[in-house]
């Protein structure tokens, strides 16, 4: 059940009505309804996945309590590592086993040995990377005594399985979401209205921007061997806006839906393509994942407290693990490695920005220097996105190579569909809207909000009529 589907358009109002008019007696009935709705939502992909979600929920609920109750450090460590190993074990089996089996077989073959890997015919459960990280952060925080264990199973189950964030984030923290589900929510008209605005803007990003760019990005990447330089450059740009519109659109919808139920989720995107360097980009892009790796991997490794080489080592570890988190393919690992390389000049010059607000708070007309920094950062991310999108490392390298070897800057035709100036104009308008609204979480809100909403709905209907591309990219992670 996708957020941009008719099924969800029917599902959401039903849950909303039941939540506020039938199950609104107390927080327990509200939470119970949301859990049932979440389990139904998740089972729409494959009901068998539900067993793994329930098991993971019970595992971390039980081990969290045992960690808190244990009187000895040995006992605390036992329950802590049990949760860590089982969670990562399931993630490894479903997501990475075949990748490692094939990689080792290829390595042995390269040395002249015959190897036939034993592969598992497993379907990757939707959202496993996200809800596994929810549970891991909860158990880690209990072990380090940052939070108390949650003894109410219903409340904890909702924290893990809450349907807006279940399959593609944001990756929530127990310190942020659990206190909200432990109290009864009261309906607030203004909050609900903001939620509707944010849902509509998320659909604009997904249906109008991402799905339209996907048509051309897919055609270019699938036929890159016959494309000229201009087409390949456009293909990388189209994919950059496809993945941004797709993922940030999903996050906007998730945040908006949560506001309808009186819950506040972590913001996941903060206009990342207006970043002036790669460090700022990663403070604005997939914020919940970046902060998760910072708090649970980078800082425990020593963070930035050590010398230069420790900072470099930790940065490379973080980005390679981040690439690996995204998928079991060498292209994702190379993508992470490239982003780590982008960090090197900042680490060597000790100019890693901590303040991400200055470019947002200042003028509508920026200086040439700031504009150059923004464009340079965007182009660097586009180069990295080529590896993220390509099927193999070889495809990515050849794609980039053809940009410099097949220098032709004319429009090309794709499957009898021409590149149209309207798409580039649409992206340009989208960028201007983002820039003009960079201080807002919901760009539709504010003055003339009803007019903006009407125009947004018309755009969704118009583009949705001609778009067959439905699935959100991050569902595969």
Residue map of PLM features:
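Membrane-embedded transmembrane alpha-helical bundles that form the catalytic cores
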Residues: 1-429, 435-476
């Amino acid at each position: 059940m996708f957020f941009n589907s008719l099924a969800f358009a029917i599902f959401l109002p039903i849950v909303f009505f039941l939540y506020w008019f039938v199950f609104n007696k107390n927080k327990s009935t509200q939470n119970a309804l949301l859990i049932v709705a979440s389990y139904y939502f998740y089972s729409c992909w494959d009901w068998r996945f539900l067993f793994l979600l329930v098991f993971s929920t019970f595992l971390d609920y039980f081990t969290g309590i045992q960690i808190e109750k244990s009187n000895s450090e040995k006992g605390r460590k036992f329950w802590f590592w049990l949760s860590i190993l089982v969670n990562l074990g399931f993630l490894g089996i479903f997501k990475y086993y075949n990748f490692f089996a094939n990689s080792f077989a290829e390595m042995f073959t390269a040395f002249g040995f015959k190897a036939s890997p034993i592969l598992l015919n497993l379907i990757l459960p939707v959202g496993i990377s996200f809800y596994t990280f929810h549970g891991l952060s909860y158990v880690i925080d209990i072990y380090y005594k940052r939070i108390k264990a949650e003894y109410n199973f219903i409340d904890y189950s909702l924290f893990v399985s809450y349907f807006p964030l279940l399959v593609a984030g944001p990756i929530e923290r127990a310190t942020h979401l659990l206190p909200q589900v432990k109290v009864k929510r009261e309906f607030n008209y203004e909050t609900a209205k903001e939620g509707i605005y944010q849902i509509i803007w998320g659909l604009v990003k997904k249906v109008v921007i991402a799905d339209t760019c996907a048509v051309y990005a897919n055609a270019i990447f699938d036929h890159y061997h016959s494309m000229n330089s201009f087409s390949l450059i456009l293909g990388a740009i189209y994919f950059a806006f496809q993945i941004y519109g797709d993922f940030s659109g999903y996050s906007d919808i998730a945040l908006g839906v949560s506001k309808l139920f009186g819950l506040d989720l972590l913001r996941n995107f903060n206009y990342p393509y207006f970043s002036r360097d790669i460090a700022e980009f990663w403070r604005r892009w997939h914020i919940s994942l970046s902060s998760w790796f910072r708090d649970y991997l980078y800082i425990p490794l020593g963070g930035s407290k050590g010398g230069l080489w420790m900072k470099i080592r930790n940065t490379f570890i973080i980005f390679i693990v981040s690439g690996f988190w995204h998928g079991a393919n060498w292209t994702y690992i190379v993508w992470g490695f490239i982003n780590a390389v982008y960090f090197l000049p900042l680490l060597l010059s000790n100019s890693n920005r901590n303040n991400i607000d200055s470019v947002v708070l200042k003028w509508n007309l920026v200086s040439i220097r700031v504009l150059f920094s923004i464009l340079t950062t965007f182009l660097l991310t586009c180069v990295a996105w080529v590896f993220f999108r390509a099927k193999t490392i070889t495809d990515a390298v050849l794609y980039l190579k053809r940009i410099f070897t097949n220098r032709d800057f004319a429009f090309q035709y794709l499957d009898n569909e021409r590149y149209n100036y309207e798409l580039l104009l649409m992206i340009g308008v989208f960028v201007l809207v983002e820039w003009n609204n960079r201080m807002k979480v919901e760009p539709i809100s504010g003055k003339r909000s009803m007019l903006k909403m009407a125009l947004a709905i018309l755009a969704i209907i118009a583009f949705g009529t001609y778009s067959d591309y439905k699935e959100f990219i991050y569902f595969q992670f």
